UniProtKB/Swiss-Prot annotation:
Residue span, Radical SAM core domain: 67-274
Organism: Methanocaldococcus jannaschii (strain ATCC 43067 / DSM 2661 / JAL-1 / JCM 10045 / NBRC 100440)
Entry cofactors: [4Fe-4S] cluster
Sections of the chain in a coiled coil: none
Keyword Ligase annotated: no
Record note on cofactor: Binds 1 [4Fe-4S] cluster. The cluster is coordinated with 3 cysteines and an exchangeable S-adenosyl-L-methionine.
InterPro entries: Aldolase_TIM, AmmeMemoSam_rS, Organic_radical-activating, Pyrv-formate_lyase-activ_prd, rSAM
Protein name, per record: Uncharacterized protein MJ0808
CDD domains reported in the protein's UniProt record: Radical_SAM
Length: 333
């Protein structure tokens, strides 16, 4: 546990948290919406600090990040809690509980970095739950990781305030854009606009950005919803920004909703390509050609993927160009 960052003290021993757009006002002895920040005698503490509930070595493709050091392995970690209440959460067993009410292992930032060194991982991924709610642990670990020549990636719902994001030593982000404003209100108990602002700010800060949209049947799968996300990515983030359409599987409080039809995912991908996006993917469908990276100019297979295994085919890793036609590929290697 350590004192939280980005908060202010108020009268009557209350505090206001400024880590995310909720700006929770927290009374003494209580916690904020995310369960990770507690007011103890008028001081806000990150009570989930170091309570690591999940630690693994993952292919970076699993995040998913397809254009940021493809084929590499990263240390992936999580601490319990979230600042959303998504009805369809795929990781609800750790995200929808306080960090001290689920199994965890006490770890320090130094120990996380030592794991990365031991397993020759070039980077660390803050993922599985919502990293914003364990910001202090992510921040401290990121600083040490960067000092050791490693990169940091954040897999996030994008619900973070501007100043914390600016201060964070993060190199790449996969940001969920879950649907329209109504979807955020009804399904996530959150608002859309701050997520869009995070996407734009991350791009402006020079962070590598990829976007994921989990398509939930009858919730966010109509053409207007898809076009909204496609046009935002194209017009605000750039045609080169990878967009992942992922398949929903029944979980948590939406177990009565069927899996996303593969035809819907293919329709979304084709629509995005028609609207001008250069790199569009289908996720959670093992073996689908929509997992692969193709040259946006000649269509040559650049990176072949099966589940989370990636193999570079017709991509020149020195020049970042297609070996077939010479097209410059937007990728970090």
């Amino acid at each position: 546990m350590r004192e939280a960052m980005f908060y202010e003290k108020l009268d009557d021993n209350k505090v206001r948290c400024h880590i995310c757009p909720r700006h929770c006002i927290i009374k003494e002895g209580e916690r904020g919406f995310c369960w990770n920040r507690e007011n103890i005698n008028g001081v806000l503490y990150a009570v989930g600090y170091g309570k690591v509930c999940s630690l693994a070595i993952d292919p970076i493709e699993k995040k998913p990040l397809f254009h940021f050091y493809p084929t590499t392995q990263v240390v992936s970690l999580a601490i319990g809690g979230c600042n959303f209440r998504c009805l369809h959460c795929q990781n609800w067993t750790i995200s929808q509980f306080p960090p001290d009410e689920i199994p965890y292992r006490e770890m320090t930032p130094e120990e996380i970095v030592e794991v990365a060194i031991r397993y020759n991982c070039p980077g660390i991924s803050y993922t599985y739950t919502e990293p914003t709610v364990y910001y202090e642990f992510m921040y401290d670990t990121s600083v040490i990781a960067r000092e050791n020549g490693m990169f940091n990636v954040m897999i996030t719902n994008g619900y973070i305030e501007k100043e914390p994001l600016k201060a964070l030593p993060v190199d790449a982000m996969n940001i969920d854009i879950k649907g329209n404003a109504d979807f955020y209100k009804k399904v996530c108990k959150a608002t859309l606009e701050p997520v869009l602002e995070t996407c734009k700010l991350a791009k402006k800060l020079g962070i590598w950005v990829e976007v994921t949209n989990l398509i939930v049947p009858n919730y966010n799968d109509n053409i207007d919803d898809l076009l909204f996300i496609i046009h935002f990515v194209r017009d605000e983030l750039g045609r080169e920004t990878p967009l992942h359409f992922s398949r929903f599987h029944p979980d948590y409080k939406l177990t009565d909703v069927p899996p996303t039809p593969i035809e819907t995912l293919e329709m979304a991908r084709n629509l995005a390509i028609e609207e001008g996006l250069k790199y569009v993917y289908i996720g959670n469908v093992p073996g689908h050609e929509g997992e692969n990276t193709y040259c946006p100019n000649c269509g040559a297979l650049l990176i072949e993927r099966y589940i989370f295994n990636a193999k570079i085919i017709n991509l020149d890793v020195e020049t970042k160009r297609c070996k077939i036609c010479g097209e410059k590929i937007d990728i970090v290697l």
